[in-house]
């Protein structure tokens, strides 16, 4: 049965406190938030994000360019673009015409210059997905 779409597509982009992709599965702790509490904007803060990509049958075994950016509300990037390629093969037991999902997890520490709105954006060929989050100051825990 055909997958119903012809182009690779970003299925999801999700933020998390801790993300990891192992053997095609996503492991996440503290996921799907849109508010990040920051004690000190002079220090980098840890968080990650996961990208799920649906790849149609005809694009299996192709290297697809993926670019991820993190920017502030003014559009200024807080880190250089993260660039990679995504490729999935067809396993021997694949159903002809099926789509395949690739999962990418990026964990890091990021320097957010000030309180405000930030955008994580993933771009793949013609598709794009973005998620906004709000960095807010909090008092240092006692």
Question: Model segments located where?
Answer:
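Contiguous segments within soluble domain cores/interaction surfaces
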Residues: 2-124, 128-142
């Amino acid at each position: 049965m055909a997958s119903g779409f012809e182009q690779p597509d970003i299925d999801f982009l999700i933020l998390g406190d801790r993300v990891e992709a192992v053997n095609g599965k996503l492991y996440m702790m503290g996921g799907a938030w849109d508010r990040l509490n920051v004690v000190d904007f002079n220090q980098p803060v840890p968080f990650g994000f996961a990208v799920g990509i649906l790849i149609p049958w005809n694009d299996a075994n192709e290297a697809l360019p993926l670019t991820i950016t993190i920017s502030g509300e003014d559009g200024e990037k807080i880190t250089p673009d993260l660039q990679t390629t995504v490729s999935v093969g067809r396993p021997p037991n694949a159903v002809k015409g099926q789509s395949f999902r690739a999962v990418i997890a990026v964990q890091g520490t990021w320097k957010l210059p000030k309180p405000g709105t930030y955008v994580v954006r993933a771009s793949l060929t013609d598709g794009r997905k973005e998620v906004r989050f709000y960095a807010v100051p909090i008092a240092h825990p006692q």
